[in-house]
Regions:
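Bacterial N-terminal signal peptides
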Residues: 9-17
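N-terminal leader/targeting pre-sequences
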Residues: 18-174
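Bacterial N-terminal signal peptides that target proteins for export
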Residues: 1-9
Length: 174
């Protein structure tokens, strides 16, 4: 009986060792201040946990088509152009683009598609950022922003992938 109880306790400890370390919900707004949805960001820690930040987006009211999706340097989303968010989050001072042979910004992510009804739901993991207390944290220096661009990112052109105007923005802070 003691062996079974001990085994159960070990199993429970292992199961609990992979837990959500941090979680935040980001509301994204367009240039008119209207909500276009949310993105839930979370990370996991512990033995066997995947690294990075998990993102689950539920968006609406966007133009149909393919759009770029990036983390930007500052936790500011001042309409109408959202330039206040600064450039892409880039703690290692790399060039832009997931296809760049010299590496990419930590804030670079793949494009997503908005359907004909203006909606998009997707999940993605960015393995280059954290929600911790390090230099790659989306909470560092007062926070960052999650940005949606008007066009697709070509995944290689520096500094922003020819992704066009910034059409929606959400502040990421603790």
């Amino acid at each position: 009986m003691k062996t079974k109880s001990f085994s159960l306790a070990i199993g429970l400890c292992l199961a609990l060792s992979i837990t959500a370390a941090a979680k935040t919900t980001v509301e994204l707004k367009d240039a008119q201040g209207k909500s276009v949805g949310t993105a839930v960001l979370w990370s996991k820690t512990g033995k066997g946990a995947a690294s990075g930040v998990f993102i689950k987006a539920d968006l609406h009211g966007l133009p149909p088509g393919v759009h770029a999706f990036h983390f930007h340097q500052k936790a500011l989303c001042e309409a109408p152009d959202f330039k206040s968010a600064g450039p892409h989050f880039n703690p290692e001072a790399k060039k832009h683009g997931l296809e760049n042979p010299d590496g990419h910004h930590a804030g670079d992510m793949n494009n997503f598609t908005v359907n004909a009804k203006g909606q998009a739901k997707f999940k993605v993991v960015n393995k280059d950022v954290t929600l911790g207390d390090d230099s790659h944290s989306l909470f560092s220096n007062g926070g960052t922003a999650l940005m949606i661009h008007a066009k697709a990112d070509d995944l290689k052109t520096d500094p922003a992938g020819n992704a066009g105007d910034r059409i929606a923005c959400g502040v990421i802070t603790k």
